[in-house]
A protein has these predicted regions:
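Glycine-rich, N-terminal phosphate-binding loop and its surrounding beta-alpha-beta segment
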Residues: 66-127
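Buried, small/hydrophobic-residue-enriched core segments of structured protein domains
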Residues: 4-47, 97-106, 115-119, 124-244
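Low-complexity, highly charged intrinsically disordered N-terminal segments
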Residues: 36-90
Length: 244
């Protein structure tokens, strides 16, 4: 396989983007189960408020439109047969989605507005299947959807820092300067291009200073931003200075 072809292989089959144990959960629900309704909340921690952000990115990138094919289902079946054992994968369930829904996922996902601050122990997002034959699908998607923890965490922490800095500016500075008081230089400090993009985008909810280009691009591509959401300046580094 050429490098260019393998670049995005981990996200090219949605059926395999879940935890292994979920492959067998379709067998474990009580007979007659038709609908499963699940929700996401922040149980609490060091902050009393949670800033919700990042869901739209995951919906548009992974879940919207025709996202499952027969080829995906067969690949997943072969994988699970070897990974867990024959007969453990829900071939008919996934083929039902391919044949009857054109590869679209029969679920409804609702959420609070992105960027909003919500008290902990409140619902942030819900998901429910709309086809009674796909009761197993609701929590199958949990693995992917819970990745919102990262942009939520960045947005919440960044928001708390903004409040702390703003308090000090009111005491001994100029509150009008708050948007540029915490600059994001995190591009090189995270584990992937996707992490950089969604993390930096979350930070830009609260501040406007960033050198993480990926965050601006995420907002432009997945949030239809028409404005320049982040700003930087001409600046030097060691190599340009020590060269003299």
């Amino acid at each position: 396989m050429l490098k260019t072809e393998s670049r995005d292989f981990l996200s090219r089959n949605l059926v395999l983007q879940t935890d292994s144990y979920k492959f067998t959960h379709w067998k474990q629900y009580p007979p007659g189960t038709q609908y499963v309704y699940s929700y996401l909340e922040s149980r609490g921690g060091m902050f009393s408020q949670t800033v919700f952000f990042g869901l739209q990115y995951y919906l548009l990138k992974y879940l919207c439109g025709s996202v499952v094919t027969e080829e995906d289902v067969m690949e997943a079946r072969d994988f699970v047969d070897r990974h867990i054992g024959p007969g453990m994968f829900n071939v008919e369930g996934w083929m039902h989605i391919v044949r009857n829904w054109g590869g679209r996922l029969p679920v409804v996902i609702k959420a609070v507005p992105e960027g909003s601050s919500v008290s902990v122990q409140n619902v942030l997002m819900t998901i429910e299947n709309t086809d009674p034959a796909c009761y197993w699908l609701t929590n199958y998607l949990e693995t992917l959807l819970l990745k919102v923890w990262y942009p939520i965490t960045v947005a919440t922490l960044s928001h708390a820092i903004r409040k702390a800095i703003l308090d000090k500016l009111h005491r001994s500075g100029d509150p009008a300067l708050i948007d540029f008081k915490l600059h994001d230089f995190g591009y090189r400090g995270v584990s992937s291009e996707e992490t950089a993009g969604i993390g930096a985008a979350a930070h830009l909810i609260n501040f406007k200073g960033t050198d993480t280009v990926a965050g601006i691009r995420v907002l432009q591509e997945f949030y239809q931003s028409q404005e320049m959401e982040g700003f930087s300046i001409p600046a030097a580094e060691h190599s340009t200075i020590t060269a003299w």
